[in-house]
């Protein structure tokens, strides 16, 4: 299979590129390197089945790019992922996350692409749900422009499916962590703790430490993207998570124990807009995609800490 990955130099995108190449597929990686790191693709660059194009989904000639690459499947992971930036500059967020997706869909349907596997959001789309773990039937109620944009991108891609037969599936991950994660931002808290504790620097837990997230290892998330490239799940969203809530304070203990560092984070006031809880029900992915989370938190944290030890 010939595949194209947008956001290929990013955390999840680069791990997906490696998986696709290991599975024997040809891969074209596309990234503007505004947030992705070229070094994440060092292993891929040495392989004959990989080609890289530095371009962004908003301004590039995507029709020409896809016509030349001739992918069967496009994995769309290029995005503006900072929720706080989406609040500060919703127009920029919409330009990247909505217009970028629309431009990609238009280019894909003109270029004979069979399917787009789209990276959605497992937390931001649902806002503050009534039930945990949260399944895909929960009402979409985004509490941020980022969540609204991700939901809009799903709707646009689904409309192209109805109008032109361009297949699509949406993967909505929980809080992804693992090697190559950038050590900043709320979503990168495992990497933030790991890097700081390894360096002997202070760490911070916001609020009383009871906020919970559903932490899912990057290899498991990549596996969901790969499984979604077939015919199953056409036009549907799939939550990808463990169904287990881990508090900020507990997570710090897990990372500190793996590092061998004191489990003594500083406390800071809760941050405005932070969700109190987030946890996903992934039983639909189990039933339709035969996917489930295989990596336990302690094993995933160990792999992440080992990665940062070597950086």
What are these regions (language model features)?
Residues 46, 58, 182-186, 244, ...:
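Residue-level signature of the cytosolic catalytic core of signaling kinases
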Residues 45, 78, 108, 185, ...:
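Hydrophobic aliphatic residues
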Residues 1-176:
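N-terminal Rossmann-like NAD(P)+-binding domain of SDR-like oxidoreductases, especially those catalyzing
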Residues 195-311:
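C-terminal substrate-binding subdomain of Rossmann-fold SDR/epimerase-dehydratase oxidoreductases
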Residues 175, 181-182, 211-213:
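Heptad-repeat alpha-helical coiled-coil signaling segments
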Residues 152, 156, 160, 193, ...:
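Hydrophobic alpha-helix immediately C-terminal to the catalytic Tyr-X-X-X-Lys motif of short-chain
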Residues 145, 153, 186, 248, ...:
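Conserved donor sugar-nucleotide recognition element shared by glycan-biosynthetic enzymes
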């Amino acid at each position: 299979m010939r595949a194209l990955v947008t956001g290929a130099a990013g955390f999840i995108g680069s791990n997906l590129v490696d998986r696709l190449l290991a599975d024997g597929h040809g891969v074209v990686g596309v990234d503007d390197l505004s947030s992705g790191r070229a070094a994440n693709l060092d292993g891929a660059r040495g392989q004959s089945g990989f080609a890289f194009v530095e371009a962004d989904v908003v301004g590039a000639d995507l029709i020409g790019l896809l016509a030349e690459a001739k992918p069967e499947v496009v994995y769309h992971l290029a995005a503006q992922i900072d929720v706080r930036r989406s609040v500060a500059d919703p127009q920029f967020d919409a330009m990247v996350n909505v217009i970028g997706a629309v431009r990609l869909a238009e280019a894909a349907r003109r270029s004979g692409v069979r399917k787009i596997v789209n990276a959605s959001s497992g937390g931001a789309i649902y806002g503050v749900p009534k039930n945990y773990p949260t399944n895909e039937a929960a009402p979409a109620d985004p509490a941020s422009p980022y969540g609204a944009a991700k939901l809009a991108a799903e709707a646009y891609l689904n409309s192209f499916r109805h109008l032109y037969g361009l297949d699509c599936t949406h993967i909505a991950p929980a809080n992804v962590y693992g090697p190559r994660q950038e050590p900043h931002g709320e979503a990168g808290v495992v990497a933030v703790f790991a890097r700081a504790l390894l360096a002997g620097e202070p760490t911070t837990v916001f609020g009383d430490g009871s906020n919970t997230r559903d932490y899912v290892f990057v290899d498991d998330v990549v596996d969901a993207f790969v499984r979604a490239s077939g015919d199953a799940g056409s036009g549907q969203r799939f939550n990808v998570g463990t169904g287990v809530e881990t508090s900020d304070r507990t997570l710090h203990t897990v990372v500190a124990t793996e590092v061998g560092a004191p489990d003594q984070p500083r406390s800071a006031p809760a941050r405005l807009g932070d969700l109190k809880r987030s946890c996903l029900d992934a039983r639909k992915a189990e039933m339709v995609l035969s996917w489930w989370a295989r990596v336990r938190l302690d094993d995933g944290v160990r792999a992440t800490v080992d990665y940062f030890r070597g950086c």
